[in-house]
């Protein structure tokens, strides 16, 4: 569903509209969580997502978020707003569309993050309980 925002921005959850090259460029070259990720892997991750939401300004993709999971647990990944578009509340709107306005609003969500904790706390995220375990990726 497309949602207009002020300042010429819009949110859209249409997977066909996602600019995979734009996502790949940011995630592979500018993120701390997936430097060097191949375009093929990025394309597969987007194809396997249960929900994607992108942020556009005048038709150009300037933000993105992806969710994987099922009706019981959703994992939030690859969330970004390009640096030149930050500081306008767009990250809040991107997450609101992804989490609160989507079909998984009542589902348990998880994420890994090294920054933006205050932003995620606005959507109910907090430290994981002692019952959560993680297996690191093998290299």
What kind of feature is each model-predicted range?
Residues 85-94:
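Conserved acetyl-CoA pyrophosphate-binding loop and the N-cap/start of the following alpha-helix
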Residues 82:
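Residue-level recognition of the GNAT/N-acetyltransferase active site
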Residues 1-16:
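Conserved N-terminal entry element of GNAT/NAT acetyltransferase domains
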Residues 14-42:
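Conserved GNAT-fold acetyl-CoA-binding loop/helix
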Residues 98:
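Active-site-proximal cofactor/substrate-binding loop regions of enzyme domains
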Residues 42-58, 63-79:
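A conserved beta-strand-loop-helix scaffold within acyl/acetyltransferase catalytic domains
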Residues 92, 104-139:
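Conserved active-site alpha-helix within GNAT-family acetyltransferase domains
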């Amino acid at each position: 569903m497309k949602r207009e925002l002020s300042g010429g921005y819009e949110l859209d959850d249409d997977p066909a509209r996602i600019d995979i090259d734009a996502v790949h460029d940011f995630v592979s070259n500018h993120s701390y969580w997936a430097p060097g990720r191949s375009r093929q892997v990025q394309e597969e991750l987007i194809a396997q997502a249960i929900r994607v939401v992108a942020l556009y300004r005048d038709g150009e993709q300037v933000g993105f978020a992806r969710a994987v999971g099922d009706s019981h647990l959703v994992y939030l990944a690859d969330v970004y707003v390009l640096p030149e578009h930050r500081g306008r509340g767009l990250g809040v709107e991107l997450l609101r569309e992804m989490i609160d306005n989507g079909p998984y609003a009542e589902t348990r969500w998880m994420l890994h993050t090294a920054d933006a904790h205050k932003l995620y706390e606005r959507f109910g995220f907090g430290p994981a309980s002692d019952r959560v375990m993680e297996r690191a990726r093998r290299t």
